[in-house]
Each structure stands twice: as structure tokens, then as C-alpha cells.
Amino acid sequence: MKKLLCRVLWMSVLAVAAVQFAAAAPASNIAKPKAPAIPEMPRFRFENFTTANGLPNNHVFAVLVDGNRIWVGTENGLALYENHAWKVFTTADGLAHRAVLSLALYKRTGDVWAGTMGGLSRISAGRIDSYTQLNSGLSNDVVYGVSVEGENVWVATAAGACRLDLHTGQWSLYNERNTPMFEIWAYGVSATPTKVYFAVWGSGVLEYDQKTGRWDRYDDPDGENEVVVMKDQGLIHEIVSSVSYVDNILWASTYFGNSRYDGRYWHNFLKKDSGLPSNFTNQVKGVDGKRAWFSTDKGLAYYDGVNWAVYTPSLKDGKPEMTVRDAQGKVTPVAVSSAPA
């Protein structure tokens, strides 16, 4: 019994000594916790295009990617980049107006629809046909947004929205008389087989149900045009600049932040509590239900559902810069590369 007791006491002394030795050991001998890894976010090789190498104007309103072709709407014409060369379409080619504000692709035929400051144009196999208030049912010649779904072309104009049935050629007009909008300045449109959404300046977001023909409106529920009383109570602001509907998720950009809506709950994004470089957002493009791109006046932002990446030009030399913001709010610069313009 004495031997067993002595053995237990001796083992206890060794254990205490081991703990004391570990506590007194140099810090260099103790494994340090690894720093959290930087989230994997899209990294790009940037190549810039200006009037010096083919663009008709440096003021770009819209970009459309069609396979290996890139269409660019500028303040002075429509540009097509294909096979490392630019081709420019102007009013001399039949374009409705030199300022091209929006672009959409009709995938079945490959036709490109261009919304301009002077009407709506269709580019088909090199031929351009234009629609205006004078020769069609277009509600206004200032076309801010266009979206093609099925056999319908949906258009957002400065005087409401309209739809062109490509099969019958019939136009339908939508404004304050037959929809819930009380402002008719439609900035953007996103059409799918089930729902069509319009971004309306001062009237929030309009939703059209393709099956029932019902219209609904989403706006800032607290009625404050500048202050969001409760962050996720609804659409962040009534001045909506664009909408993107994908995977049953609505993304909406405004000049005061951005919103995501899943049909039941809203989630809003502000510069102060997200990775947005600015609340002033001109365009949002949803990748899917979790990911989206945001075009702001302070840079391009990408959200993967948790983390953020921001792409901006350097103030020193104009070269691209990238930062990543993780879920904990830590911001880390990331190296990116560029190609000569």
C-alpha cells in the first residue's frame, strides 16, 4: 500500500513539474495558432480599353458578353470587340441614338437589343432596325433598360415600361395608370419566365407575375428617403437604379445601398457594415442566389455570400488594386496583374 501511494505521489510531482516546465519554456518553442487564410476570391488579369485603342468613347454605360464577343454601349456609339479588333456602330448605321444606355441578348437568334437616348435598336446579322415613339408603340425614346425573355422584349423608359411581343409585333404599355408605380422613371428591368422586375426611380421595385398578370410594388417601408430606420425591414431606398433576378432571388441596387430579397426576407448592404466601397451603386448583377457584382462610384465589388472583394484603380498610377474583406471584417490587400492598354 505504501509503495502504491508513493508511486501515485511521484507521478503527481512529475506532472506538476512538466506543467511548470511548459509554462516556463520560451515562447518560440510553443506552436503559434495560424492566421486565418485569406478567402479565395476571383482574381483577374485586367486589360483596359479606351479611345486610344478602339473604343468610340471612354464613357461606358453598358457591357454585354456574348461568347467570345463583347458589346459595349458608350456615349458615342455601340462597339463590338471580336477577334482582338473593335467595330463601331453609329447613327449612320441605323442606331437610334449615339448614346447607348443598355444592352440585352436574344439568345435564340443572337440578336442584340440596345436601349439608347433616342429609341430602341435591334442589331441582327449586321442589320440595325430602330424603334421610336414615332414608328412604334415605345412609350418613350429614352430607354434605360432592356431585357429579353422568350418572345418578349421588356423595356424600361423615362415614361414607364413597355413590352414588345416579337411574335405578334404588339406593344403593351405600363405606367401609373395600370401599375402601382407613382413615378414613371424606369431605370432597369430583369425578365425571367416567372417574374419581371423593374427598377423605378422614386417608386422602388415593381414586380410582374407572368402567370397571373399581377403587379406588386416594393418600396422603403419606413418612408424615409435618406435614413433607414430598421436595416432589414424592406427595400433599402425608393430610388432604385437596377434590378437582377436570378435563382428566385431579387438583387436591387440604389444610390443609398443595396438589397437582396428571397421572397420573404430582405437583407440590405451598406458600406458601413459590408464590403461595399460605396453606397452609391449604379448596377447590380446577380450570379446566383448567393453571389453578386456591384458597380459603384468608388469601385467594383463582388460578394460571394460571406466575403467581399473590391477592385479599384490605384490613385497613384491607375493600375488595378484588389482588397478582400472576410466575414470578421478584416480587410487584406491582394496582388492582381494588368496588361498594357
Task: Report residues per predicted region.
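Hydrophobic membrane-targeting alpha-helices
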Residues: V16-F21
